[in-house]
């Protein structure tokens, strides 16, 4: 029998065993087929490993799943390296995690272009799952994953730029990445953008953004408010009040408190009352101050 016929025979036998639920025998036949050049047989072994790992329609067996993934790795299946890395990171069958093996497997998958592996490496370095927290490596792998289309990593890269963590603070780059992740449908996109805009709006007042831009600050606060942050103008008002040495800051603080008070924020009403009582950014008006204090 020719080698091609033998390969087809082994692959067919593997499929029959798979259909009959004889997974161990299926792996044996698929491996023989893979050894003879049937690439799809190696993928079948990896898929069987996934079934065994998750218990999808079969008895859960992480040890056998690990064995299947190792076979997949031999044939260069990137998902096999990813799944191995995930298993080693959490620990097999209730055992302790193995950071060294996890890193090696995930790096192999990432080197083959797997974005999930790159994202997981970013998370692992970010949270110290591989030992110590390593922000530079976290940023490196989050960026790889983001460039490959991982939306969660896009948000994380944005936050790294926003905070200046292991990379120069750059609110323009931060905003670009966060908006990109949101536009591409990440479930946390709205919340991440809302928080970013809220914090950045104050930084454009204090200069922590790298420059002072009151118009940008107001625009960001308006968008954060539209996304559900009803307190944002109150906090922006406090930022202006804290920097009241600037002649135009008290009137701007007043406008911010007024905007927040219109949203029903009690603390903003009290702050607005103080502005009227002390004539801070507005002409003194004790009657209005008392009214606002009562409402707060």
Predicted regions and their residues:
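Ankyrin-repeat and related helical/solenoid repeat scaffolds used for protein-protein interactions
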Residues: 133-139, 143, 148-163, 168, ...
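Hydrophobic face of amphipathic alpha-helices that form TPR/SEL1-like repeat modules
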Residues: 11-17, 44-54, 81-90, 120-127, ...
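A generic tandem-repeat structural signature
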Residues: 63-93, 100-108, 120-123, 127
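Core solenoid repeat modules with strong leucine/isoleucine-rich periodicity
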Residues: 155-156, 175-183, 187-203, 219, ...
